[in-house]
Amino acid sequence: FDEKGYIYDLSDLKCIRNLSKDALIQSTYDGKVFSLPLSYTCFGFVWNVDMLKQYDLAVPENREEFLNVCETLKENGILPYGANKDFGLTVPVMCAGLYDVYQGEGTEQKLQELSEGTTPVSEYMRKGFDFLQMMIDKGYMDPEKALDTIPSSDGEKEFFAQENCAFICAIYRGKTFEGYPFEIEMTPLPLLENGSICVVGADQRLAINPNAKHLEAAITVVEALGQTEILDAFAQNLGKISSSKNATAPAIPQSDSIIACVVKGSQIPNQDFRLHFNVWDTVRDLSQMLCQGHSPAEVSKEYDSRQMKEISMYGKHG
């Protein structure tokens, strides 16, 4: 779209300064701000808190606690994780694989090396695929059940509501918190040695066609909608997170920890336009292959191959 001249660069609009750093990253391609995200969302784990309490467990806050919770539940005959075939695989694999890129030192440098292909993506993502394999090997999730489960479906919700598993992966929105006969809590993914991380995404974008007849009017509308108080109110009405620097969210006590994580920033974007290859869809496809019996080594090698192929197609040629 950029090369064809369909993208109007919003960088000079005053309202762009109102966006949170993570929302801005998700709206920037090759130095151009191509859209105004009207709201923002995130993916996290939703826990059956009552079930954990039955076994004297608390909602985990780091990797060690997470593995202990999973092992204790499994020993008591409970399937810990009710994964689905889509983001229920993608989100934990991305969190376990890419946290180093976004939360370590030198994020921009790492992204550039990945984007140029000087660093193979498997250098990070192998850890993510190994994590998924570990979950399968230890019986913390059922790969066949996962491949049969559609995300955000009634079937997935019923499976969790009937206490067939202890936690699922969900997208943050008002509906996520409704309809359970037990206490729930939505948290970031406690997969790091020293804490948690989540995947975030800009939602409902506004963009401007530079060839529009009424360009000035379109710019005026975007400026008006991009005011902090408008973004905050819009997100509140939708039951989502504001894309403003405030990152306000509806007052849902069960989501305090995941909102705090989003506000902190440096989370993993579901789409990072600084990378000249796909992450979200590819990680989903390769995670499904892993659930079908392919090894972490095989899917990592396949990802490296796709990375190089896509860079040669979409990367910048100097």
What are these regions (language model features)?
Residues 1-2, 170-183:
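A ligand-binding cleft/hinge motif common to bilobed small-molecule-binding domains
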Residues 184-187, 235-289, 312-318:
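Long, aromatic- and glycine/proline-rich binding clefts that accommodate carbohydrate-like moieties
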Residues 72, 114-146:
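Glycine-centered hinge/linker elements that transmit conformational signals in sensory
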Residues 9-19, 101-127, 191-199:
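Short, solvent-exposed loop/beta-turn-alpha elements that line the ligand-binding surface or hinge
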Residues 1-43, 58, 67, 187:
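Hinge/lid segment of periplasmic solute-binding proteins
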Residues 52, 68-76, 151-168, 292:
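Short helices/loops that flank or line small-molecule/ion binding pockets
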